[in-house]
Amino acid sequence: MIRSIEQSDHDQILDLNQNALDAVGSLDNEDLSLLVKKADQAIVVDTDGDVAGFVITLPQDADYDSSRFRWFADRYDEFVYLDRVIVSPDHRREGVGSKLYDELPEDVPVALEVYEHNDTSLKFHRSLGFRRVGELEHNGTVNVMMLRPAS
């Protein structure tokens, strides 16, 4: 079942996030609450009460202090920023990621960044129609900036 993130999901989401720091930035409960408040989309795939995965997107006019978000805002007039998407290791290869990406808008470009060393994610996003549109070095890590054009 796909549904909105609820307060009761926060512990599971934070656990998933903190166990994926090789691919996403760190979050604490306060950060997550603020992010969900600013989001235009904050959803989970719920499998019998277990958060199998989640996605959080932000509108282009969000008040969001992120160099990666600003990189897109400085270059594109219209986009949705995919801040993070994580699938639980217990639910990989079950179509959870595909379900989350199916929920992304198709009529607006979707922008995201992937760490340069994350070959699996880069390959996955290219297969979904995302293309490389630049790079940004942030805290010593090279972020590959990717965009999926509107359909």
Could you tell me what each predicted segment is?
Residues 87-106, 123-127:
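Conserved acetyl-CoA-binding loop-helix of GNAT-fold acetyltransferases
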Residues 98, 116-135:
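Conserved active-site alpha-helix within GNAT-family acetyltransferase domains
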Residues 135-151:
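C-terminal "cap" of GNAT-fold acetyltransferases
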Residues 56-84, 92:
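Conserved acyl-donor/pantetheine-binding loop and adjacent beta-alpha core of acyl/acetyltransferases
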Residues 22-48, 62:
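Active-site rim helix/loop that mediates acceptor-substrate recognition in acyltransferases
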Residues 101, 106-118:
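Conserved GNAT acetyl-CoA-binding A-motif
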Residues 1-13:
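A short beta-loop-alpha structural element at the N-terminal edge
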Residues 50-53, 120:
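Glycine-rich acetyl-CoA-binding "A-motif" of GNAT/NAT acetyltransferases
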